[in-house]
């Protein structure tokens, strides 16, 4: 599977075209809208989320609630475009209209793509950069991820994300009996955190940052249960599943780090306390005593839950902006302010779920069949039976 997205933050709509989704997948707009609504929630979101009520239109590739195997086109309207029709319109402006246009951006914001993108593409108005580099684009990435989640769900694979740190407030490790329980707890939390006490402290940290005109980041974790053993490859570097997952997490706006399993903690432990001992029983076949590897070894799944974490930096759009330089006058200035969140970590956990789900669904389809869900399901069942008795 693959997809491409198009659209600007304040343009008329966001679009994604998805290719390679097998035929026979049950899919309706509400499957996607549910994920879009989850992305819009979360303590610390800005005023933009009060304007947009994201709803998807499925334009192709689905008929009567079932995928056809042909490309799927999804569109999400930007309601805020009504206030930006002249500024973000596709048609040329008159000389007078250009003079009257007030939202030209010549002051790059530290931490954003503004300056680098303007230099790369030769844009004197950096709105041409910030409109596309905006995290608003993750709307349709979540839409694509919702399709991937449906693929996984029909194959018995469950995905959940949650927040484990915001602004230096760390959640305690909370035990849960199932992915369903994890989901029910996090969906009820304004910051998508399992630890209620830490969640309250996180909200206070967000409030404090907002009051100071600042922003804060954090860490999200995605857990996936039900993946078969041996998905991915050790044969070539670019087929390693852990490498693909790491790239997917790092592709999310403002993410600056990723780890799988115990991650960087492995540097502090001896090998005897890192590697997961292998067990076998007649009912389940091969399993592990621990899961320090986070469900991945040698670029392939081990059959244990996949555990991936990502670090999100504080959003660089601040209400007490940092110093910058005007690209026209070269004079020092405080950076332009765009409407923004004070913390988007809870929403980012939903985006992280989406990109992880996409990579796993893609890997399964490549390995177990391309054309129809029935074939993929049968092949996975045969593979699991083979692996248990290996």
Curated annotation (Swiss-Prot):
It comes from the Bacteria. It holds the Pfam family Chorismate_synt. GO terms for cellular component: cytosol. Pathway: Metabolic intermediate biosynthesis; chorismate biosynthesis; chorismate from D-erythrose 4-phosphate and phosphoenolpyruvate: step 7/7. The keyword Lyase applies. Its EC number is 4.2.3.5. One of its GO terms (biological process) is amino acid biosynthetic process. It comes from Bacillus cereus (strain ATCC 14579 / DSM 31 / CCUG 7414 / JCM 2152 / NBRC 15305 / NCIMB 9373 / NCTC 2599 / NRRL B-3711). Reduced FMN (FMNH(2)). Residues 95-117 are annotated as: Disordered. CDD domains: Chorismate_synthase. This is Chorismate synthase 1. Belongs to the chorismate synthase family. This reaction introduces a second double bond into the aromatic ring system. SUPFAM superfamilies: Chorismate synthase, AroC. It catalyses: 5-O-(1-carboxyvinyl)-3-phosphoshikimate = chorismate + phosphate. NADP(+) binds at residues 39, 45. Its cofactor is FMNH2. Homotetramer. The keyword Amino-acid biosynthesis applies. GO terms for molecular function: chorismate synthase activity; FMN binding. FMN binds at residues 132-134, 253-254, 298, 313-317, 339. It is an enzyme of class 4 (lyase). Keywords: Amino-acid biosynthesis, Aromatic amino acid biosynthesis, FAD, Flavoprotein, FMN, Lyase, NADP.
């Amino acid at each position: 599977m693959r997809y491409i997205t198009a659209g600007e933050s304040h343009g008329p709509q966001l679009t994604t075209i998805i290719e390679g989704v097998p035929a026979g997948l049950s899919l309706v707009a509400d499957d996607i809208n549910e994920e879009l609504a989850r992305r819009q929630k979360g303590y610390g979101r800005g005023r933009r989320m009060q304007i947009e009520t994201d709803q998807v239109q499925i334009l192709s590739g689905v008929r009567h609630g079932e995928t056809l195997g042909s490309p799927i086109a999804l569109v999400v309207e930007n309601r805020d475009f009504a206030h930006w029709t002249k500024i973000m319109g596709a048609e040329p402006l008159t000389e007078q209209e250009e003079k009257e246009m007030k939202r030209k951006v010549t002051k790059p914001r530290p931490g954003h793509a503004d300056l680098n993108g303007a230099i790369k593409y030769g844009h004197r108005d950096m709105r041409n950069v910030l409109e596309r580099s905006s995290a608003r684009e993750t709307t349709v990435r979540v839409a694509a991820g919702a399709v991937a989640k449906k693929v996984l769900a029909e194959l018995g694979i469950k995905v959940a994300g949650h927040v484990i740190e915001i602004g230096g407030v760390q959640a305690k490790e909370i035990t849960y009996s199932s992915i369903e329980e994890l989901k029910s707890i996090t969906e009820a939390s304004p910051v998508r955190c399992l630890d209620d006490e830490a969640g309250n402290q996180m909200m206070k940290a967000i409030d404090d940052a907002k009051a100071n005109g600042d922003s804060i980041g954090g860490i999200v974790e995605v857990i996936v249960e039900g993946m078969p053993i041996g998905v991915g490859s050790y044969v070539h570097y670019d087929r390693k599943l852990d490498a693909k997952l790491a790239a997917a997490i790092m592709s999310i706006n403002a993410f600056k780090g990723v780890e799988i399993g115990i991650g960087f903690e492995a540097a502090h432990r001896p090998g005897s306390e890192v590697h997961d001992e292998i067990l076998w029983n007649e009912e389940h076949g091969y399993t592990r005593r621990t899961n320090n590897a986070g469900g991945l070894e040698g670029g392939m799944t081990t059959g244990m839950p996949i555990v991936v974490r990502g670090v999100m930096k504080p959003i660089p759009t601040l209400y007490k902006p940092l110093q910058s330089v005007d690209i026209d006058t070269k004079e020092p200035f405080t950076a332009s302010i765009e409407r923004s969140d004070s913390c988007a970590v809870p929403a980012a956990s939903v985006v992280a779920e989406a990109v992880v789900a996409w990579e796993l669904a893609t890997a399964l389809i490549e390995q177990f069949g391309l054309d129809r869900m029935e074939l993929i399901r049968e092949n996975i069942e045969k593979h699991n039976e083979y692996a248990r008795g290996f």
